[in-house]
């Protein structure tokens, strides 16, 4: 992987990630394909929304179908028939989500398989091996996603262990002679001094990109913004920056304003299945009775397959009848909305008028522009 930084506007960056499997224009949004599928979508449909890179889930694909079945197809690309780049998370967040089912120790994490209850062990080394078999274009180190709230002492212990796990991840990745990219993950909760130690430690180990982890886990937005403003300037300029698990359209805008290049989130797909649809002026809840007789498209400005062909009334009807097609059409629209948003952000950075774009964006959705302290 090669990262080209083309231009900046304030802290915002316009660049490209270049892989053998294709180019990703940044800032980029990555749809989430947890089980080797973006729910309800074919790879061709996902590509048509404008997505250039997907996120796959190491933890879930390891438990089912497993590494051996993946290897029968070559790797995850061959298995799911997505021929662009894939980033895989390391399993750290899923382990964090298991709560009482897991036991975190220095060597790794012991937990019960949520599918059948059998004991399982995941370590930094094992995560690197699974991601190698998946053929991930971007591999994430294995870390502990520090929960929120966490006091300073717990956050410090967690961050320090994540640093040791980062070094072990790097070592195993290199032993496997993996030619793809490996990203470090910055932890430290909402504490700037802990984030400083984490960034410094990761940069010393050396990675192809750096992710900001442990945000969007329940902390106030002001804390997320403050941490991004503090951390991003410390990340080497020539490396891509990835904000994990974020987020709402406003979160993407705010991340870009603070120097983030990459995002992923289940929000567009999950919200689509629940009838929450993103449009130019905010959010439409298609379940509401007011859409029952509305012959207009979801969004006059959207060029997606759904908006070109179907009315709000039809989408309301599909939702009320619990039809699978409704979830699919909603997902196509929401993913296209996110890709259109990123394309407009990239254009605004190129033209040097991102702050004007930000002002217009918030005006349309009826919210104030968050303060920028950087």
UniProtKB/Swiss-Prot annotation:
Transmembrane segments: none annotated. GO terms for biological process: queuosine biosynthetic process; tRNA wobble guanine modification; tRNA-guanine transglycosylation. Its EC number is 2.4.2.29. It is an enzyme of class 2 (transferase). InterPro entries: ArchSynthase1/Queuine_TRR (IPR050076), TGT (IPR004803), TGT-like_sf (IPR036511), tRNA_ribo_trans-like (IPR002616). Pathway: tRNA modification; tRNA-queuosine biosynthesis. Substrate binds at residues 89-93, 143, 187, 214. Binds 1 zinc ion per subunit. The active site is at 89 (proton acceptor), 264 (nucleophile). Belongs to the queuine tRNA-ribosyltransferase family. This is Queuine tRNA-ribosyltransferase. It comes from Photorhabdus laumondii subsp. laumondii (strain DSM 15139 / CIP 105565 / TT01).
């Amino acid at each position: 992987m090669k990262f080209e930084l083309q231009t900046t506007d304030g802290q915002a960056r316009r660049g490209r990630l270049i892989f053998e499997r294709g180019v990703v224009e940044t800032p980029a949004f990555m749809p989430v394909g947890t089980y080797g599928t973006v729910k309800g979508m074919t790879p061709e449909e996902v590509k048509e929304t404008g997505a250039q890179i997907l996120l796959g889930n190491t933890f879930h694909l390891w438990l089912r179908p497993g590494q051996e079945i993946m290897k029968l197809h070559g790797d995850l690309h061959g298995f799911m028939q997505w021929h662009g780049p894939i980033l895989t998370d390391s399993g750290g967040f899923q382990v964090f989500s298991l709560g009482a089912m897991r036991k975190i120790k220095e060597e790794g994490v012991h937990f019960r398989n949520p599918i059948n209850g059998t004991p399982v062990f995941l370590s930094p080394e094992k995560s690197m091996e699974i991601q190698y078999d998946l053929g991930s274009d971007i591999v994430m180190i294995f870390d502990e996603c520090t929960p929120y709230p966490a006091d300073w002492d717990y956050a410090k212990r967690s961050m320090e262990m994540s640093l040791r796990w980062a070094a072990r991840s790097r070592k195993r990745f290199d032993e496997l002679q993996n030619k793809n990219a490996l990203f470090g993950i910055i932890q430290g909760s909402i504490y700037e001094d802990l984030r400083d130690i984490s960034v410094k430690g990761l940069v010393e180990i050396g990675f192809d990109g750096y992710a900001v982890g442990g945000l969007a886990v329940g902390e106030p937005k002001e804390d997320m913004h403050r941490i991004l403003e503090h951390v991003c300037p410390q990340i080497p300029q020539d490396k891509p920056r990835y904000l994990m698990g974020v987020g709402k359209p406003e979160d993407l805008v705010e991340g870009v304003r603070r120097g983030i290049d990459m995002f992923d989130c289940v929000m567009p797909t999950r919200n689509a299945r629940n009838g929450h649809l993103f449009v130019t002026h905010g959010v439409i809840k298609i379940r509401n009775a007011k859409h029952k007789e509305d012959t207009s498209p979801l969004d006059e400005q959207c060029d997606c397959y759904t908006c070109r062909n179907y009315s709000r009334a039809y989408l309301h009807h599909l939702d009320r009848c619990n039809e699978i097609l409704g979830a699919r059409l909603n997902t196509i629209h929401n993913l296209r909305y996110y890709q259109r948003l990123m394309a407009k952000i990239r254009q605004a950075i190129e033209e040097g008028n991102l702050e004007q774009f930000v002002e217009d964006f918030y005006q349309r959705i009826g919210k104030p522009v968050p303060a920028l302290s950087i």
